[in-house]
């Protein structure tokens, strides 16, 4: 397995929007495999369960059947989306189907790349291998501190920082 650290934004291969609008296919599509999260970060609305209930946002993971329907619908675009981002406000690794979602999107050719952002608390070597084998192109790790104390203060999670 070969991995590299790279900037999150690729300034060299960006599409100048003024050359492609109006778009017939989205460049980037965000799908949230999980509306739930195992952290309670101060900056994130997902940590406020009362607010999430008030706005009608469920606290659950996306069912594979729904993801399969979305992928089937994506085939109606004129071309593949550039990036399918499998994250938004929840922790994507809470979804047990995450590797299968990555694999399906790649196999069906509905996107050029699949990426995700995770707090990495659920990322084990075994899970990492499954996700890589499924075809994930990029994983961003959201680091909420540089010590156990900072993590606890910021995300309300007791965590051994060295485990991330």
PLM feature spans:
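Conserved nucleotide-binding/hydrolysis micro-motifs of P-loop NTPases
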Residues: 146
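Conserved alpha-helical substructure of the radical SAM core
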Residues: 1-138, 149-153, 158, 162
């Amino acid at each position: 397995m070969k991995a590299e650290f790279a900037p999150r934004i690729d300034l060299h291969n960006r599409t100048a929007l003024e050359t492609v609008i109006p778009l017939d296919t989205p460049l980037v599509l965000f799908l949230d495999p999980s509306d739930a999260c195992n952290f309670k970060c101060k900056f994130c609305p997902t940590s406020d369960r009362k607010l999430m209930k008030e706005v009608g946002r469920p606290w659950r993971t996306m069912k594979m059947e729904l993801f399969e329907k979305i992928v089937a619908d994506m085939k109606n675009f004129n071309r593949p989306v550039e990036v399918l981002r499998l994250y938004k406000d929840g922790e994507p690794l809470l979804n047990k189907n995450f590797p299968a979602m990555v694999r399906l999107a790649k196999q069906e050719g509905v996107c050029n790349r699949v990426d995700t952002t995770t707090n990495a608390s659920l990322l084990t070597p075994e899970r990492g291998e499954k996700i890589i084998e499924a075809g994930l192109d990029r994983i961003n790790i959201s680091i909420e501190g540089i010590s156990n104390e900072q993590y606890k203060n910021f995300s309300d999670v007791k965590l051994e920082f060295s485990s991330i």
